[in-house]
Amino acid sequence: FVLISALIGVFSALDLVLFYLFWEAILIPTYLLISLWGGPQRDHAALKFILYTLAGSALLLVVVIAFRVEGGSFSIPALMNQSFSVNFQQWTFLIMALAFAVKVPLFPFHTWLPAAYGQAPIAGSIILSAVMAKMGAYGFLRLGLPLAPEAAHFFAPLIIAMSVCSILYGGLLAFAQSNLKKIIAYSSLGHMGFVILGIFLFNINGVQGAVIQMVNHGITTGALFAMVGILYQRSGSHEISGNLGLGKFVPAFMGFWGLFAFAGFAFPGTNNFVGEFLILVGAFERNLWLGAVVVPGALLAAAYMLRPTQKMTWGEPSNATKWRDMSGREWACLLPMAFLVLYLGLAPTLCLKVMNPSLKHLIVAFQSRVSVTLSIDKNLFSPVNNAESLNGKSTGGSQP
């Protein structure tokens, strides 16, 4: 309850002090969740998690005080209407970026991730990947871009480089794993790399894709971790080798797994495709070479999700003949997520309608405060146009 309340506080705070207090309050229940109910190496994982996140966010209090001294207020909306010197923006943005990059996490601040995700109980892994990872991305959108726009533009190449490294490195690490929890953990590194990349493209396709990808990644990754938990109750193992040949004996379970795995590598028609497609379009709009470098990350996702799926479905079965298929409680848990995977993949207009007004305001305000011309096609703010483009129809905008 404390953890969920603090998470809600972070995403709803309009005051820097409250934002900071809720941000720090999340650490204690998360540490206890890992250290008390985690796996065999839970103490090491919990300590590593709290040391990394404390090191990343300790200086955030300095930023909070600095904005109060310079801007005369803790109110985020009031500070957004003020202009700060470039030097002030740069050092405050660097501190904020460090805290947010650790929380996402971005390469090279990701080394706490496999230990925390791997040792946390399934409920903890779901919260870490589906919700807490989004705090860093939200921090960039709520504080980084509005309060320090010129610094955000100045450091954008560095953040983009870190994001691309996260996408490619996370994909390679996920492909090399034999543990299902670690595969999903490293896949989150790659997916969140796409999110941060989309934010720092500074075009509407990129930012739209980033926000909708945050929603979709939470659904898909949460579902995959839930299925790993169901699997562990039956086999007692998180290893691929301990869960082979399930397709014949638990077909309903593997049907759900296949759907969420395909969503995990952004197969067209699933929810993750929408955000990833928009981010790739935004990347090619920003720079053709940037788009070309990012594309292999999407291909890696297919490789690391299809490999375990193939082995778990058609491999040589072990003790799966004794298993029962899904219970009523498990159906009730997974059906809503399966519905969202398909609905948001086939009809993304629901999310686009909700987010477009805020994103339009964010991008236009950012453009007006940065002394460069950013490409914004106002037709692209129509969720109908974007939804049609995803279905292959002509939009008349800049999308192919």
Name every feature range the model reports, one short phrase each.
Residues I4-F19, I28-Q310:
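Hydrophobic transmembrane alpha-helices and their helix-loop junctions in integral membrane proteins
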Residues E24:
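Short phosphate-coordinating micro-motif centered on Lys-Gly-acidic
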